[in-house]
């Protein structure tokens, strides 16, 4: 993983993983290695190698969390390459997955696709391309693609998700003040959006850890707990709020 995503030595990482797969490993460990291998192939834009490996993990670990994760990543891959109906059919099944985080991620991506598919397919194609650039850590290209939606396909449907992706890039680039302002635009301007609780949680963590604004972070945690009671982040927010309060 370090070789592929940090040191940009994909081929060496692939060789190491393929060598490891020849060892006498448990079914779970083989599945984990195949997942890493698929992630690298996707990073390299070898999407058919990636989808084959994700499908193998899904099939061999169907009822396990790693199987659900592989199915989600395969749906995400299809979204990246513009096969939206295929992705949506898988995501709609995954929304009832045992893992709350997988179910939540599936719900979010499902809504991004379904809302934009109905409203503006060109904006959706651009969002998908930007997301793929983000996966590949090509942040400058991703930002340009997101900005192009604002210029050529401005719409309120895609805006909360677009802002969240720009906030993620700012966060990754350690531009925490920009990330903070973008998260705020989501939960203040689009409070009814399915992204609002996610924006609150991410902003609270950022305010606490990187901007040293503990009081403001507590306000975000409290708002999330009070106003988004069904959020997957409520328990985490409650624990963080108590820790800061005490």
Which residues fall in each region the model found?
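Acidic, polar-rich low-complexity tracts and alpha-helical solenoid repeat scaffolds
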Residues: 1-246
